[in-house]
Swiss-Prot record:
The gene is CHS1. Residues 98-108, 356-823, 882-884 are extracellular. GO terms for cellular component: cell septum; plasma membrane. It comes from Cryptococcus neoformans var. grubii serotype A (strain H99 / ATCC 208821 / CBS 10515 / FGSC 9487) (Filobasidiella neoformans var. grubii). GO terms for biological process: cell wall organization; chitin biosynthetic process. Polymerizes chitin, a structural polymer of the cell wall and septum, by transferring the sugar moiety of UDP-GlcNAc to the non-reducing end of the growing chitin polymer. It is an enzyme of class 2 (transferase). The keyword Iron-sulfur does not apply. This is Chitin synthase 1.
Length: 1236
């Protein structure tokens, strides 16, 4: 088969093409249309947030839009329109010289204008809408007295008077009038003059007629009572009730000669008495007579007729003053609209507030408790996809039927079987064996079947704990690592992954951050000194390329935990050596090192040298390949997690497969350090237990904080038959790794709030999956203790919140519908964030106004009720959820600081929309303040970093080892065993595996089918100068228990207890001086070997990362060191060369299984036969029931070559020195040495 095996073969058959299948599903069926509406290819993927979509022929890609009117950049035009008064010359004169900075400034002004407009709208709706639609003279319904409802009352000029104590007059009987109709109008009984009505200046009839109308005379000229003054009222003993006389529309319709203008009821009887006939040419008279004669059943409202023309409109004021009898006491349309809006606002806001409160309580009480329960045996008993099976869309050869990863078959790098890829072996006829065909695996320590029971993985998922460091000090970093290592989570299932963001020394620190981190590592000596490995970073211009060194070992906690640890130190390119912060690319780049690595592992995509180096070291440290990891915990370097937090988070992932991200509660560790930390305590609490708890009910937590959040790397599908990449999905990784950002919106998304932006991307990509909050998982972090640092931190948070909510509000697939949806809640959060300054000002105005003029009605009290509910419910939530009264005191402190939270911080943030720096948050020694507008003049012309798949990197690694071995043999033939740099004498090549015992030979060592011969492979320098399979070190740990597959037992026979005891007796030597640290010969597959705990040592004598960085670029190392050069090997000369003498009991107890040595022959000459010794493995059995299995055949002996330095390691512990037990014999792996 040709090397282009992934290319589909052309159709060359002479048979005709198959005919079309029948359209009916069964005989006699009917013709039906297929379910075209459910075709997944018709789903339109969301457009990227940052980079525009590229041209693609995928049916899921959005259709390209043609250039036209709709493609105009309206936002850029709006930015220029709002800043037309600031030409570029003026901005350059004020110091804004870069084009990007000027554009960012214009966009900032445009956003501030929008914030001001929204604030104005909110202010008008809150304070001005009521006054505009319902003036003060129309809005108070309690000022009215309805006509006919109150006895012993009459009205004068629209006001109700009490006549119960009045003196009876000879010409007017007040009591008789009140009995006829309580409240009727008696204004025309009083004497009035023109001076009483200054608005009546016209000569028309309505203004110049008589003022009086006698009840006993029809002449209309006599007035029975004196003028309307307080003296007259006192003499008549009638009292003004200060209530307006109210009329209903029905009453006005029934009353003769009454009509309405603009809500005023007018008694036109005096006018008609004085003008019994129509006045010729009088437009006002015509309207009056038309309304009174033609609208007898409709309330006689003349408002529209009077306001249509100028002359009648001028008469309105005079007519209201002269003929008023009362008011319409029904609510006016304006007041109705204002009241309706007020009540709708009350219902909506109250519903949202109460719903948030209720759902937060329900989640804290019930839902979260279910998520943290231990995983049951029933859940672990179901079948699931094997972690070594790659997801759909991965790079899988056409012959790989199961889709297994190339490193998964049979055990990994040393074999390349069972789905692995390698050069293959030639047959006699010259054809190659198909390297992807499933071959029998000699190892059964890991499950090989496509579907496995989840119990084989166990309740503890393989988890990466990512710690991103920048300029933190030793105490912060050690506290974080100590808290992770001390969690009640197995050290075999967690990997601490530390990323140091550049060669940086924090302000006030004596050592650089990389030096601090590496100094805490108990390094694994097999990896030697790391070399810088290239990778593609986040940056512009030449910053797109970067290099990093990978330190591997264990972090040893105070309570004895030995946790596998990887430290990635970003050291930068050679030209950065003289810069202030070489290698620094930001926190997002640190996260993307991990995300890109696991994405390439998941899809078998092309790897950078850094990825391959990480792959090898993780495999060696953990005993499993990286594709076994399913979750990643992201923690900041100043955060300390609680001991049970990691287990709670993983249990949450177990119970709900739809959860893609989960965060815990973050508490403040320095709450009493200053007033700045004190005002943050309640804010942290309420943002988690109120906001995030409510969002968790919908599964849509909009911000998973970067200081303490767990993401799912990949999830099993509902049918457990395939993987769904989550965090490492290419769409997420590509969008999160954008380097070229131009607009202010993009920079706020990517440069300030990378954690929130990652949550936004995941919710947009997987709107049906969940981001939740888990209150049982807790951590403590150090909050800003000075106001300047708090100001800088909240500026980043507020600005990133605004821009991320602007993107989330456009996601239509979030949970819920209309007002009962997560999208509506996001919209309210966005508006609420923008109008915070206006809201706090209106709040104080409301409080002051309520104190000066207390509310007199329910409607006036509604704003105060809302304010009390919004501020009071959190206190109730505290008592319900935590039952800690002390948080009520912290709430009072928070309320006192409301002007800071809602006015000072937002206003400062909005005005600094164009500042993309971290400000005062993390200062570096010698750092110069930058706003993030660095316009790099260098152009990224492509990367020099090689990208190759794992198979190709592995071939290059093995070829390099072969070249080094060939070179060593040649040197030995020329100069003898003691030549300069001989690795057996402590030379530099010990890190390459050139110890006393060479490594195992592998079928990867063949050059068949390779593009390069072993001497022409150009990638050796990118592999790394170490051999993780160095037999001078213990094999990797057993990460998974052996499976119960019966196939694994076909090569052995059961031994009795006596025979087992004899084997154990013959496998050890009681002389402690003869014990050695060398393992058996051959490279084991890392997950197929029983490990004693790895021999490790610190890098106390090694150069620091900073010095190492300078050393690598300024002084190249010679190929061979002096004979007396120090070595990183942990042999007998090491101070801790034999720490494993007590491990035999652990082997005997069944904690480790035997090392299978099939196909691991030495590259050197054949070793002497060891006789008939037996390799045995001890299974984990109850006490007294154990048995062992006798292995047939054996690999090469390990006796030869070990006599000079001592023994090696067998499956049951340290082997005795061959000088003690006989020349050429071994204890452990037996066999003739040629059976395999």
């Amino acid at each position: 088969m040709s090397s282009n095996q992934d290319v589909p073969l052309p159709f060359t058959s002479s048979r005709p093409l198959p005919s079309r299948q029948p359209t009916t599903s069964r005989p006699g069926g009917t013709l039906k249309r297929n379910k075209t509406l459910t075709r997944p290819e018709r789903h339109v993927a969301p457009a990227p947030l940052v980079a525009p979509p590229t041209q693609s022929f995928s049916p899921t890609s959005p259709l390209p839009q043609s250039d036209g009117f709709l493609n105009i950049d309206w936002w850029r035009l709006w930015a220029y329109a709002t800043t037309f008064w600031a030409p570029p010359v003026l901005l350059r004169w004020f110091g804004i010289k870069e084009k990007q900075s000027r554009q960012a400034w214009r966009e900032k002004i445009a956003l501030c204008w929008i914030a001001v407009l929204l604030g104005g709208v909110v202010g008008f709706v809150t304070m001005g809408l009521q006054r505009a639609l319902c003036p003060a003279d129309q809005q108070n319904q309690s000022m009215y007295q309805r006509l006919g409802d109150t006895n012993m009352t009459l009205s004068i000029s629209g006001w109700a008077f009490n006549i119960s104590t009045s003196i009876t007059q000879s010409n007017v009987d007040f009591y008789s009038l009140a009995n006829q109709m309580p409240g009727q109008d008696i204004t025309d009984l009083f004497t009035r003059s023109v001076s009483d009505y200054p608005a009546c200046t016209s000569s028309l009839a309505y203004s110049s007629g008589a003022f009086c109308n006698s009840t006993s005379s029809s002449s209309g000229t006599s007035c029975v009572l004196s003028s309307m003054s307080q003296e007259t009222f006192d003499s008549l003993q009638i009292q003004n009730t200060s209530l307006l006389e109210g009329y209903s529309w029905d009453q006005v319709a029934k009353l003769e000669n009454y009509m309405v203008i603009d809500g005023y009821v007018l008694n036109m009887s005096p006018y008609l008495s004085f003008n019994p006939t129509a006045v010729e040419g009088d437009e006002v008279d015509s309207i009056i007579r038309h309304v009174l004669s033609n609208q007898t059943g409709s309330g006689k409202d003349a408002t529209r007729l009077f306001f249509n023309r100028q002359v009648p409109q001028d008469a309105v004021g005079c007519m209201k003053a002269r003929y008023v009898a009362g008011r319409i006491d029904k609510i006016t349309p304006g007041c109705f609209v204002a009241s309706f809006f007020l009540y709708v606002s009350l219902v909506v806001i109250l519903a949202v507030v109460l719903a948030r409160f209720a759902m937060a309580c329900v989640f804290n009480w019930f839902l979260s408790e279910k998520l943290v329960k231990p995983v049951t045996e029933k859940e672990l008993g179901r079948k699931g996809i094997n972690p070594t099976i790659m997801p759909e869309g991965a790079n899988v050869s056409v012959n790989n039927k199961l889709g297994t990863a190339p490193w998964a078959g049979g055990g990994g790098a040393a074999e390349g079987k069972g789905g692995g890829v390698g050069p293959g072996k030639k047959l006699v006829n010259g054809k190659k064996i198909n390297p992807l065909s499933p071959l029998p695996s000699p190892s059964h320590s890991l499950p090989n079947a496509p579907l496995i029971t989840l119990s084989q993985i166990g309740p503890e998922l393989f988890t990466v704990c990512l710690v991103t460091c920048y300029s933190e000090g030793p105490s912060s970093i050690r506290g974080t690592l100590e808290s992770i290592a001390s969690t009640n989570y197995s050290d075999r299932r967690k990997l601490i992954w530390v990323v140091c963001d550049g060669m940086i020394t924090g302000q006030g620190e004596k050592r650089s951050t990389p030096d601090v981190c590496v100094g805490m590592l108990d390094a694994d000596g097999r990896f030697g000194n790391p070399v810088p490995m290239g990778y593609e970073a986040v940056g512009s211009g030449q910053k797109r390329e970067n290099r990093a060194m990978v330190y591997a070992g264990h972090y040893v906690s105070r309570n004895g935990h030995r946790t596998p640890t990887i430290i990635v130190v970003k050291c930068g390119m050679p030209q950065e050596a003289t810069e202030k912060k070489p290698g620094n690319r930001g926190k997002r780049d640190s996260q993307l090192i991990l995300m890109n690595f696991f994405s390439r592992v998941t899809y078998n995509d092309r790897m950078t040298p850094l990825d391959f180096d990480l792959f090898r070291k993780i495999w060696t440290l953990m005993g499993v390949t990286p594709d076994y990891f399913e979750a990643v915990l992201m923690v900041d370097a100043d955060t300390r997690i609680y001991p049970d937090s990691l287990k709670h988070l993983v249990n949450c992932m177990h119970h709900d497969n739809m959860i893609m991200g989960v965060c815990g509660e973050t508490r403040i560790a320095n709450k009493r350090q200053s007033w700045v930390t004190a005002i943050q305590v309640f804010e942290y609490f309420i943002s988690h237990h109120h906001v995030k708890a409510f969002e968790s009910v919908f599964g849509g937590v909009t911000c998973l904080p970067g200081c303490f959040s767990m993401y799912r790397i990949k999830a099993r599908k509902d049918g457990d038959n395939d993987w769904v990449p989550i965090l490492v999905k290419p769409e997420i990784v590509n969008e999160y790794s954008q380097s070229e950002v131009e607009t202010l919106h993009q920079k706020n998304l990517l440069l300030l709030g990378e954690d929130r932006f990652l949550s936004t991307i995941m919710l947009r990509t997987f709107p049906r999956r969940k981001n939740i909050f888990l209150p049982q998982a807790r951590c403590r972090t150090v909050a800003p203790d000075t106001f300047s640092v708090l100001l800088s931190q909240r500026r980043r948070w507020i600005n990133s919140t605004v821009h991320n909510l602007m993107e989330l509000v456009r996601v239509r697939d979030l949970c819920g519908t209309f007002c009962f949806s997560m999208q509506f809640v996001v919209f309210m959060d966005l508006v609420g964030t923008v109008v915070l300054p206006v809201a706090i000002c209106l709040t104080f105005a409301l409080i002051v106004n309520s104190i000066i003029t207390p509310p007199k009605s329910f409607e006036e009290a509604i704003p105060l009720m809302l304010l009390a509910i919004v501020l009071g419910l959190p206190a109730i939530l505290i008592l319900i959820t935590t039952r800690k009264v002390v948080y009520v005191a912290w709430m009072l402190v928070y309320l006192l600081a409301l002007p800071i939270w809602n006015f000072v911080l937002p206003v400062y943030s909005f005005w600094h929309f164009d500042d993309f720096s971290w400000g005062e948050t993390r200062r570096v020694e010698g750092e110069i303040r930058s706003k993030g507008h660095d316009d790099s003049t260098a152009v990224f012309n492509g990367t020099t970093i090689p990208l190759r798949r794992w198979e190709d990197w592995e071939k290059s690694r093995l070829r390099k080892l072969r070249r080094e071995e060939k070179r060593r043999k040649e040197m030995e033939r020329q100069f003898g065993a003691g030549f300069h740099g001989d690795p057996r004498l402590g030379g530099d090549l010990r890190g390459m595996g050139m110890g006393e015992r060479p490594w195992a030979r592998s079928e990867y060592d063949s050059d068949n089918g390779s593009l390069y011969s072993s001497e022409e492979d150009m990638w050796g320098g990118e592999v790394g100068g170490y051999n993780e399979h160095n037999p001078a070190f213990p094999p990797p740990p057993i990460a998974l228990p052996p499976t119960d597959d019966p196939v694994s037992n076909i090569n052995g026979e059961t031994l009795g207890m006596d025979e087992m005891a004899a084997i154990l007796d013959s496998g050890f030597d009681d002389d402690p001086q003869s014990q050695s640290t060398y393992p058996p010969l051959s490279h084991p597959r890392p997950h197929a070997h029983p490990p004693p705990p790895p021999i490790s040592r610190t890098l106390a004598n090694a150069p620091s990362p900073v010095r190492r960085h300078q050393h690598e670029y300024n002084a190249p190392q010679p190929r061979f060191n002096r004979i007396d050069s120090p070595s990183f090997g942990s042999g007998p000369n090491s101070a801790r060369s034999s720490p494993h003498s007590a491990d035999a009991g652990r082997y005997a107890a069944g904690e480790y299984v035997s090392i299978d040595r099939q196909d691991t022959n030495d590259l050197d000459a054949q070793m002497p036969h060891s006789g008939g010794s037996v390799s045995s493995s001890v299974e984990s059995r109850p006490h007294g029931v154990g048995h062992a299995k006798k292995r047939s055949g054996g690999g090469a002996g390990i006796g030869a070559g070990t006599g000079a330095r001592g023994g090696g390691y067998g499956p049951l512990g340290p082997l005795a020195d061959v000088n003690e037990v006989g020349r050429g014999q071994t204890r452990g792996y037996g066999g003739s040495g040629k059976d395999r």
